[in-house]
């Protein structure tokens, strides 16, 4: 099986990490992958560093390389458009965001759409995509070493116009707890005791999964696909997007080390059982085979 991956992102966000993890996982399974991504993108540079076949993204290269591969996998909206314009190969499209579909014509020709959550699947269906064309493939993350820190960690930029960051800061002030901001989550999780993830639109939340994999209890917004990975009071805390509710959630974990430990252990187990990179790779391969059969 030969797969051409397309990603137009210029930053290394959750979606780009998933592309990189998918390609490295596919290589372990004997699947040949090639990436087309923007020339200056971190994803392209990281793929080359991992010795994965990768080239700058462009319409002509999509057209040329699509003919040499069995299937094209577009990982975002712009690359979806490029695939439709430049290729007649079987097409799989990942949909990671919770926004409504803006251009329905784009969503009529792919062999399968990979929704990152059941919530995103419902958004696709509302946009006119037939249910039988949608497969839910959850993000996968590596299992990190258990965190041993004391910090209350929050993302400095979660791509949500800073609304979530402002809310986290307000809640931490109410709870009289200092926040540590991070732009390098995987590295900084080593210092974390609590992870706060607040957003107003979320397809799933791969940053949350990464924290859970390190056994860090999470306080997260009750929104989008997040309730599919966090079971309130079972493996984390879901809260309404109000400073008071968030402050209460942080305070519960701060004031009850036993609760924090229980939720952190359950969170790590959840990732082990359902959200590893291997789970994501194998489920994606199943979809590839279905499309090509």
Set out the residue ranges of the language-model regions:
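Conserved acidic donor-binding segment of nucleotide-sugar-dependent glycosyltransferases
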Residues: 232-233, 237-244, 252-257
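A conserved mid-protein helix/loop that constitutes part of the nucleotide-sugar donor-binding site
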Residues: 13-24, 160-174, 209
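A short, well-ordered alpha-helix in the C-terminal region of glycosyltransferases
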Residues: 252, 259-274, 283-286
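Short His-centered aromatic/hydrophobic patch
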Residues: 58, 74-80, 95-96
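Short hydrophobic beta-strand element within catalytic cores of glycosyltransferases
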Residues: 36, 217-220
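A conserved, positively charged/aromatic
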Residues: 66, 91-118, 122, 127
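Conserved donor-binding/catalytic core segment of Leloir-type glycosyltransferases
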Residues: 4, 145-163, 169-173
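Aromatic "clamp/platform" in nucleotide-sugar-dependent glycosyltransferases that forms part
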Residues: 200
């Amino acid at each position: 099986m030969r797969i051409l991956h397309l990603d137009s992102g210029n930053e290394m966000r959750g979606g780009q990490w998933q592309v990189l993890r998918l390609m490295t996982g596919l290589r372990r399974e004997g699947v040949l992958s090639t990436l087309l991504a923007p020339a200056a993108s971190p994803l392209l540079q990281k793929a080359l560093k991992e010795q994965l076949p990768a080239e700058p993204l462009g319409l002509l290269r999509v057209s040329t390389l699509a003919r040499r591969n069995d299937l094209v996998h577009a990982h975002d909206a712009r690359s979806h458009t490029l695939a439709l314009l430049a290729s007649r190969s079987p097409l799989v499209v990942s949909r990671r965001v919770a926004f409504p579909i803006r251009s329905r014509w784009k969503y009529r020709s792919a062999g399968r759409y990979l929704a990152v959550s059941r919530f995103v699947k419902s958004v696709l269906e509302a946009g006119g995509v037939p249910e039988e064309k949608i497969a839910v493939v959850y993000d996968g993350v590596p299992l990190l070493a258990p965190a041993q820190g004391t910090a209350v960690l929050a993302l400095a930029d979660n791509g949500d116009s800073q609304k979530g960051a402002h809310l986290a800061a307000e809640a931490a002030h109410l709870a009289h707890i200092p926040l540590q901001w991070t732009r390098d989550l995987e590295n900084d999780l080593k210092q974390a005791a609590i992870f706060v993830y607040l957003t107003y639109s979320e397809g799933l939340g791969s940053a949350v999964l990464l924290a859970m994999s390190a056994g860090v209890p999470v306080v997260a917004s009750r929104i989008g696909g997040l309730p599919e990975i966090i079971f309130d009071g079972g493996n984390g805390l879901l809260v309404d997007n109000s400073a008071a509710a968030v402050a209460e959630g942080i305070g519960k974990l701060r004031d009850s080390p036993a609760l924090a430990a229980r939720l952190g252990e359950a969170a790590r187990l959840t990732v082990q059982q359902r959200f590893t990179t291997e789970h994501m790779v194998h489920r994606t391969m199943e979809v590839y085979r279905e499309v090509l059969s």
